[in-house]
């Protein structure tokens, strides 16, 4: 602008003065002010946008022959271009051809000079950019002595001048070098091709875009404020602080804060640093956003499983509104509505095909999949941490099994340990406070990553109020009363409620807590299945305690706690997952009912004898063809979490099973003699009508592709379903909209002046685009919205197309909701038929286990056990018995043994022998043969005759119990005391080296007393291993034939010295050969030095040990000889009593 009259004109240095003159197309651009160019023109040049200036600098220089080397024509053109830009801003629909035409007119008329009056519009158009850059301008051209003024003419003080100088210095530093403006204008956007040469070559004029506006501060960025989405997340997170939240954000799922750190560690994904806390802690005040991590949408199931398997509680927050419905709603400017839709933990994750079992099984760690609720109260009249009353409820959501129990436990907490080891929970829910002893037990069993459950167990706690028993009973009653309102079977419903209300108080307390807990996960409906409530303590099954499970290696070996090398591993020949689970239950619960056991053994025998027959082969082929875990899939249908492909697979598999035996109407028509097999096969065809009725409504091709829109068959006979009617309605609405879109093609063609209807195209997922060549762009109405384009054509949506697409999208969203609702209704309908379908699957599992036992029976050396009647005295008679696990793992096979235990004699075997001679293996093999016989399997023996044992108790191994602060000897006597309290005359007891944890005299005395008690008082069948020679001799006096001394046979030989003489100085050179055979008599030595030599103890140490051992033996023999001499003298004098005479005879035998 011109300065005031009478004053020197205000002059601003051009930015071009900062740049080095550059040669463009062979001509050097002048750096001084151009002749004939006004000051306003120079100011405009300085204040114009970077992109415009860059375009001017890069435009080719064309020399005008009339104007010489002057630049007036270019100045005129630049002025005119600025005006054209203003016009373009006012008319957004001007196309590239119009811009090119205006540029061409400017080139054809270069003469007019821009006068002062003509620059008014130019100055006005550049006022915005001038005001934006004005605060960076520092004018050094002000005359001395004249006060410097601002834009309004007011004088500036020193502070303002200093500030303007600093801003000027920053401006020069940032932009005062060649190509600075060019780089600034093109940053982040890529270089814009706006040169005149490219315009002429392409034939199209590129639109000149204004420079991108400076990016303002985002919400939640450096201002420290959270974005609306982050506030939304924080609101949900504060209600679920114990949950790792996975939030749906667009096409990804994201983690925020501490959840992102956890996800980065567990999932091995990148965690972008930021705030980890959710409480605005001062230590994170310098951070402006949450830490975050993200995963693709399609990987959600995989990563969710990994987090759950790692022991985390995982929640999925989903967007519960779609873009189409949001656009049509009132909250279009608000963030998507998000809600916590799913919550998972180890015990409540219902995976599709048992993937979590596959993950844990691969590492050898396998839990039972149970969620176990535990509570306890102090028993009346007992001290702190002594006896407690315990209640538990265990639920296996993947199969629908429910176990409950209420019992009293002692200070050793052996009963709780037994149930925990049997159930193997993957998650514990503890109600109230536990006693110190129970707390330590739970911590020990669940705390480590390689615990006896197989993997780390998640523990959650629930507070217990003062009036909890009454509240729990009321809560359970209301829960089941609500279920009974809609029930049509009154008798069944009444029986259901009566069964639940008669549960013990501790069990009711746990049941109430479990209902509340599972409601969060949407799994509370599992308690509707009261048919599958089972009491842990029942007289129809043998109770195997936790110590016995570990000692006999029933479920996993004792070395690395994997399944390989266990009894389950040796017997598992099942073909289905649900069959394998039933086999596991059978091994942990041997039968006590002789009639049921005889039926099972007879079924195994028939399948074994006809193993090559067509009927057995047909059954084997059917089971081998089942690839779906039907038990898990049925419970997922019951919960309403089954997918469409999975539902189709389940129904088709059940149909194939039912059709296979469609001709069977009665058990007698199966062709098998066994009642167990016949009844199981006869139950399979009964589900055919149920399955077929649902398959007739399903389109199999769409179900396999998980196509919700075509899942239901259009020609289905069932047309009364409201959900399917709604699907039809929405499909018709969509078809009507698409028909209108097709008819609109003619209207669009008429608008463009075409006779033929236009064709729609789809580009980058955008449908119903109308393509118009840029040469016909003038025919396009202003109301048409340009979506995209190329150099030769543009693509538009007409207002009618936009309206119809929005209407169609709304119908599509409604159709998707109708399809989901109809599918959920179908799942609910199938859930009403859960029990007959589950019974059919149970029959298949039974057949699978029986076939597995038949396959085991076909192994060499297996025979059918003979079960003696209950009236027969307790007896176990084995001929040629072998260890069922060791013979699979030992390359040289297992040496058979033969023995007999019976009442009245011999009730017990006192087993002696050298270390590593096979004593423990012998007693374990005998116990495993009994267990196998009572689960209905053939046994690895020439023959086995036995009565049913009500329990198997073991006290084996030597280890301390640090978690309970118990020494090795304390563990020994504690377990022994539990056996003495609970053993009955029909129990089998195994005691291995009792008393080794203390001194020789005390240990021998305790072992003697315990052996005397189990033989004289309890009178149970017992195998007693010992190294005490005195105990072997004393056992002979316990009664005529009550205790039989047996030992493990071996041979010994000595090595020659270097001189060729026998080594007489020590026992180091003595070689022991183990024969692993059971023989009568006592082994007088344990040959511990031989084991030490095998363990490679240094020879010098062995030589010293041998001398000490020989000296101690001589001292003991000397003392015994002196004692016997005194007794003999007393007897000779006639002073001795009958007891002394008996003692003398015993001493002589010991010598």
Curated annotation (Swiss-Prot):
| Gene Ontology MF, one | ATP binding
Which BP terms in the Gene Ontology apply to this protein?
mismatch repair; mitotic recombination
InterPro entries, per the entry: DNA_mismatch_repair_MutS-lik_N, DNA_mismatch_repair_MutS/MSH, DNA_mismatch_repair_MutS_C, DNA_mismatch_repair_MutS_clamp, DNA_mismatch_repair_MutS_core, DNA_mismatch_repair_MutS_N, DNA_mismatch_repair_MutS_sf, DNA_mmatch_repair_MutS_con_dom
Biased-composition ranges, Basic residues, are 71-80
Q: Which family does it belong to?
A: Belongs to the DNA mismatch repair MutS family. MSH3 subfamily.
State the NCBIfam families in the record.
PRK05399.1 (NF003810)
Quaternary structure (record): Heterodimer consisting of MSH2-MSH3 (MutS beta). Forms a ternary complex with MutL alpha (MLH1-PMS1).
Q: What is this protein called?
A: DNA mismatch repair protein MSH3
Which organism encodes this protein?
Pyricularia oryzae (strain 70-15 / ATCC MYA-4617 / FGSC 8958)
* Gene (name only): MSH3
């Amino acid at each position: 602008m011109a300065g005031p009259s009478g004053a020197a004109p205000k002059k601003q240095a051009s930015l071009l003065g900062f740049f080095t003159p550059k040669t463009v197309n062979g001509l050097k651009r002048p750096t001084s002010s151009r002749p004939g160019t006004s000051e306003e023109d120079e100011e405009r040049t300085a204040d114009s946008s970077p992109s415009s200036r860059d375009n001017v600098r890069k435009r080719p220089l064309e020399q005008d022959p009339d104007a010489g080397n002057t630049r007036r024509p270019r100045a005129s053109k630049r002025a005119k271009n600025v005006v054209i830009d203003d016009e373009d801003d006012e008319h957004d629909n001007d196309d590239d051809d119009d811009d090119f035409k205006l540029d061409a007119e400017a080139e054809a008329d270069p003469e007019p000079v821009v006068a002062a009056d003509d620059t008014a519009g130019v100055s006005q158009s550049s006022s915005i950019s001038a005001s934006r850059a004005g605060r960076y301008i520092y004018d050094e051209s002000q005359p001395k002595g004249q006060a410097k003024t601002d834009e309004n003419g007011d004088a500036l003080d020193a502070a303002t001048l200093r500030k303007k100088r600093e801003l000027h210095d920053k401006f020069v530093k940032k932009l005062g070098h060649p190509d600075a403006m060019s780089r600034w204008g093109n940053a982040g956007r890529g270089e814009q091709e706006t040169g005149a040469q490219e315009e002429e070559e392409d034939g199209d004029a590129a639109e000149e875009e204004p420079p991108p506006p400076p990016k303002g501060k985002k919400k939640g960025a450096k201002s420290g404020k959270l974005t609306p989405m982050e506030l939304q997340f924080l609101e949900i997170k504060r209600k679920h602080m114990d949950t790792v939240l996975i939030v749906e954000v667009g096409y990804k799922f994201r983690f925020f804060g501490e959840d992102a750190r956890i996800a980065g560690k567990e999932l091995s994904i990148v965690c972008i640093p930021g705030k980890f806390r959710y409480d605005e802690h001062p230590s994170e005040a310098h951070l402006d956003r949450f830490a975050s991590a993200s995963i693709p949408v399609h990987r959600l199931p995989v990563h969710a499983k990994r987090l759950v398997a790692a022991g985390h509680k995982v929640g999925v927050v989903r967007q519960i509104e779609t873009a189409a419905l949001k656009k049509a709603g009132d909250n279009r400017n608000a963030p998507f509505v998000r809600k916590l839709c799913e919550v998972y933990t180890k015990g409540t994750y219902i995976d599709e095909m048992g993937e979590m079992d596959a993950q844990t099984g691969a590492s050898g760690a396998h839990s039972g999949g149970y969620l176990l609720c535990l509570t306890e109260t102090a028993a009346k009249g007992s001290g702190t941490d002594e006896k407690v009353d315990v209640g538990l409820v265990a639920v296996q959501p993947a199969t629908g099994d429910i176990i409950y129990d209420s019992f009293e436990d002692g200070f050793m907490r052996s009963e709780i340990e037994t149930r925990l080891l049997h159930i193997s929970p993957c998650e514990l829910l503890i109600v109230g406070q536990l006693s110190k002893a129970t707390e330590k037990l739970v911590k020990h069993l669940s705390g480590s990553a390689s615990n006896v459950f197989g993997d780390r167990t998640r523990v959650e706690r629930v507070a217990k109020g003062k009036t909890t028993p009454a509240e729990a009973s009321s809560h359970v009653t209301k829960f089941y009363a609500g279920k009974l309102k809609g029930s049509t079977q009154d008798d069944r419903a009444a029986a259901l409620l009566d069964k639940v209300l008669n549960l013990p108080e501790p069990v009711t307390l746990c049941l109430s807590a479990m209902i509340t807990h599972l409601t969060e996960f949407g799994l509370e409906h599992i308690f509707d299945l009261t048919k599958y409530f089972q009491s842990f303590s029942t007289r129809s099954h043998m109770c195997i305690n936790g110590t016995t499970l570990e000692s006999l290696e029933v479920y996993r070996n004792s070395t690395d706690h994997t399944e390989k090398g266990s009894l389950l591993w040796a017997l598992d020949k099942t073909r289905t997952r649900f069959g394998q689970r039933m086999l596991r239950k059978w091994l942990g619960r041997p039968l006590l009912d002789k009639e049921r056991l005889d039926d099972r053994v007879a079924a195994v025998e028939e399948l074994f004898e006809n193993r090559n027959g067509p009927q057995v082969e047909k059954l084997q082929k059917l089971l081998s063809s089942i690839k779906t875990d039907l038990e898990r899939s049925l419970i997922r249908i019951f919960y309403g979490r089954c997918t469409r492909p999975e539902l189709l697979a389940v129904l088709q598999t059940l149909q194939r099973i039912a059709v296979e035996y469609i001709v069977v109407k009665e058990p007698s028509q199966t062709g098998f003699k066994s009642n167990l097999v016949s009844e199981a096969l006869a139950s399979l065809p009964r589900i055919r009508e149920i399955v077929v009725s649902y398959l007739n409504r399903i389109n199999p091709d769409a179900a396999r592709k998980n196509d919700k829109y075509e899942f239901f068959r259009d020609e289905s006979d069932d047309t009364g379903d409201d959900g399917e009617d709604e699907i039809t309605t929405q499909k018709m609405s969509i078809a009507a909209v698409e028909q209108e879109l097709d008819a609109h093609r003619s209207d669009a063609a008429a608008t463009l002046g075409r006779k033929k209807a236009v064709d729609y195209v789809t580009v980058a997922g955008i449908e119903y685009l109308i393509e118009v060549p840029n040469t016909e762009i003038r025919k396009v109405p202003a109301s048409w919205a340009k979506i995209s384009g190329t150099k030769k054509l543009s693509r538009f949506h007409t207002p009618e197309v936009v309206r119809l697409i929005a209407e169609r999208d709304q119908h599509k969203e409604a159709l998707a909701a109708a399809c989901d609702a109809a599918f959920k209704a179908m799942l609910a309908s199938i859930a009403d038929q859960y029990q007959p379908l589950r019974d059919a699957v149970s029959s298949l599992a039974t057949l699978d286990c029986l076939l597995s036992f038949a396959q085991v029976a076909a192994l060499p050396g297996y025979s059918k056990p003979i079960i003696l009647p209950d009236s027969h005295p307790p007896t176990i008679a084995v001929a040629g018995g072998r260890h069922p696990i060791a013979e699979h793992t030992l390359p040289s096979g297992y040496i058979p043994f033969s023995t007999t235990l019976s009442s009245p004699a011999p009730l017990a075997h006192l087993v002696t022998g050298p270390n590593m001679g096979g004593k423990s293996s012998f007693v374990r093999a005998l116990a495993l043969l009994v267990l196998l016989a009572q689960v209905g399997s053939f046994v690895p023996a020439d023959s086995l005759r036995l009565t049913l044992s009500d329990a198997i108790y073991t006290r084996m191994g030597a280890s301390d119990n640090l978690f309970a602060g118990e020494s090795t000897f304390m563990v020994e006597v504690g377990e022994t005391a539990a056996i003495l309290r609970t053993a009955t005359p029909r129990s089998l007891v195994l005691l291995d080296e009792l008393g080794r944890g203390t001194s020789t005299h005390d240990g021998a005395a305790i072992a003697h007393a315990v052996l005397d008690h189990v033989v004289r008082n309890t009178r149970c069948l017992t195998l007693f291993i010992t190294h005490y020679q005195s105990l072997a001799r004393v056992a002979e006096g316990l009664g005529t034939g009550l205790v039989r001394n047996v030992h493990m046979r071996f041979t010994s030989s000595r090595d020659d010295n270097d001189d060729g003489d026998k080594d007489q100085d020590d026992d180091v050179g003595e070689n022991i050969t183990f024969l692993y055979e059971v023989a009568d008599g006592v082994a007088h030595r344990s040959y511990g030095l031989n084991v030490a030599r095998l363990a490679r103890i240094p020879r010098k140490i062995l030589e010293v040990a041998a001398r000490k051992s020989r000296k101690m033996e001589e001292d003991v023999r000397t003392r015994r000889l002196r004692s016997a001499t005194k007794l003999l003298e007393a007897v000779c004098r006639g002073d001795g009593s009958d007891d002394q005479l008996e003692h003398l005879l015993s001493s002589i035998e010991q010598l």
